[in-house]
């Protein structure tokens, strides 16, 4: 039983260390824009139990039929490297980059945020939107819809500020990201 207890302590310690080493990573995947590619990429994540926190997909070159898939996931460096290797083996995948570790990158998200307001808090809602540079894209007697683009922390902060003022609904694009500077 002593050996068993020592093994249990070892695995518990390994699991604890693994959780501490996990961090958020932004993975950029350039793929051929063809039917079923996204399903294969998502299948790789779900089949191995990797969680996707954010997903953004768009065509980036109409002539060469290329799209970029941007995925935010959590994991240790070892786990992220394993994900990258598995993604690179998929046939329609051209390149896989971990924008978190491969150098500086720019990351932005866009959100549409609907807030119901009355005469009492209408001024406060407008003042906060100006502070965050949120654009009013729709307005009615009792509500506003704001468009806000920026870092995830900025969007989360704006949402939390609007929550007590009458937040009704949110739609977010998922993270869009690109590496900075010249690609080596």
Where are these regions (language model features)?
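Long, contiguous binding/interaction regions
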Residues: 10-67, 72-184
